[in-house]
Amino acid sequence: MFTKHSVEIDWGGRPLKLETGKIARQADGAVVATYGETVVLATVVAAKAPRDGVDFLPLTVDYQEKAYAAGRIPGGYFKREGRPTEKETLVSRLIDRPIRPLFVDSWRNETQVIVTVLSHDMENDPDIVALVAASAALTLSGVPFKGPIGAARVGFANDEYILNPTLDEMADTQLDLVVAGTSDAVLMVESEAKELNEDIMLGAVMFGHRHFQPVINAIIELAEKAAKDPRDVAIIDNSAIEKEMLGIAEQDLRKAYAIAIKQERYAAVGAVKEKVMAYFFPEGQEPKYDKLRVAAVFKELEAKIVRWNILDTGKRIDGRDAKTVRNIVCEVGVLPRAHGSALFTRGETQALVVTTLGTGEDEQYIDALSGTYKETFLLHYNFPPYSVGETGRLGGTKRREIGHGKLAWRAIHPVLPPHHEFPYTTRVVSEVTESNGSSSMATVCGSSLALMDAGVPLKRPTAGIAMGLILEGSRFAVLSDILGDEDHLGDMDFKVAGTESGITSLQMDIKIEGITEEIMRVALGQAREGRIHILGEMSKALTAARAELGEYAPRIETFKIATDKIREVIGTGGKVIREIVEKTGAKVNIEDDGTVKVASSDGEAMKAAIKWIKSIASDPEVGQIYDGTVVKVMEFGAFVNFFGTRDGLVHISQLADKRVQKTTDVVKEGDKVKVKLLGFDDRGKTRLSMKVVDQTTGEDLEAKQKDAPAEAPREAAGE
């Protein structure tokens, strides 16, 4: 019934198996990849005919994690998987980025890649297995894919690189780097690092590239057994259109791309395009060419003009040379009520970044396959349509916004203080208010400034820069601080963030079929120069975290109580802790190990809450005097609440320094009194006294009598 084919190799000390022919046989390509006991299914389906009216590759990649893969049932009312999680969105992008450049340019058939995690062994992260499985499924599917690609995760610890570190090993590594590419070149890099230098980062990329070659060979071996026949792809000859267009548009386009200001340049380019369309599609005449083909040739002409001008003259669209960074203006404290804020402007790219400090109540609970954990640092990136002078729909967070936010998160995360030293939940929001290239790196710079403005003690300020590439044959130019046009018309988006000491995040996306080690080395060196320059400009606004938190930020005090006292502080059904919060206005968080965090922007409220909690969690001391409240009056005495929730009995004989006939002659319910703890009886009941305490001053009368000097004896008579 099944015609199965499989290939198995040893990879990084664990078996990697690729199998096809048993599951999802109606898909164009389907591969089950098993690494350790992590199992992933990747499927590829492409439409039979091209999609009408599109001039781009209609590719969709969806990565999904099933709860059953980890032996779990989803939470929530419906008990099934819902909208994609952040991890699923990020891995979908991780798969998309290296495969997209390898499709034949003219492929316009709707293509969908679905990758499903079927089993997770809690050791091997499914993302690398998903990349490998997707590459294999595409290679078998018959779609015009110029792969296969391989991928690997690289760690770095004890001055050694680690291939595909397990989840436990990742806890101790200084680097989390994912690299993907073909047998000849690197296509994609994504990483977070603890301030590592350029040589270590480049070494990690090349280490990963070398060590995923066996995976590429395994996919080729599987394809030789099971690949489908290649699909036919129409080869379109646009040379006639190009020849006519050069005559009517080249000079005008060159003039347009000499305009430095983005909106003016776009208007000039738009005018040239209107002229071209009017020429090729005159009113009342049958057009010779398809509109999409003409538009595609126009875009190619734009790219050629920009690219060759840079290679031939060294001059870019806005007049800069390859290494110059645009003018930078940094401001902090721009929003009066925010805990920390910064406005970072670089040329025509601008980010307003705001930091908010919260408490344990604000931590984000992440429900992952590997288990639930709490996240105390959140970074959110927003890209509204007005930032590029356009109208658009405002709605849910887009994939791009999630991806850019995570890139900035990776850049900042390594320089944050440990949570036990700075016990706040920190949320950073970047509002991109203007964009003309590298808004994610503006977010990194603005986030660093906003965090320091809020008083978050970063290890060092962090900056980011986006690099571009123009590659024609053996000639290339690496561009620092790229514009939006240089990003769209160039061959590489290479983003590097870090401190003066090293790199904290590196992300690279290649739009061609890969780049060499030499180009990456040049780009990293040039990026360091740019990063140091940007850090210098940022230092004009702020060089380190402010000594004090913002005026409106909550203060957090941390202390410990005995674990057997946690129940008393919380109370039945949370009654006690709710009362503390309601009456003091402070926020209280108690952890299982007895760590208590009290937060409030009001110092008096914080002191009151801390005193209340400590009074409950600690034991009263015999001989000490306490303020109390009479809570119940009996014939034999009065019960007084004197130590948190603790009550004790003042026997009728201890009410006053005289004979008392009735308890109510001295006290009634609600009276505020001062009591001394005498001790505990045989049953553990608390014994209190009022008569040995001055009810006005709180003075210990018993101790006063003991300390008083003895009366001198009278002199004998006649002496």
UniProtKB/Swiss-Prot annotation:
GO terms for biological process: mRNA catabolic process; RNA processing. Its EC number is 2.7.7.8. Residues 691-719 are annotated as: Disordered. Residues 554-613 form the KH domain. Pfam families: KH_1, PNPase, RNase_PH, RNase_PH_C, S1. Its main location: cytoplasm. This is Polyribonucleotide nucleotidyltransferase. It comes from Bradyrhizobium sp. (strain ORS 278). The lineage of its organism: Bacteria, Pseudomonadati, Pseudomonadota, Alphaproteobacteria, Hyphomicrobiales.
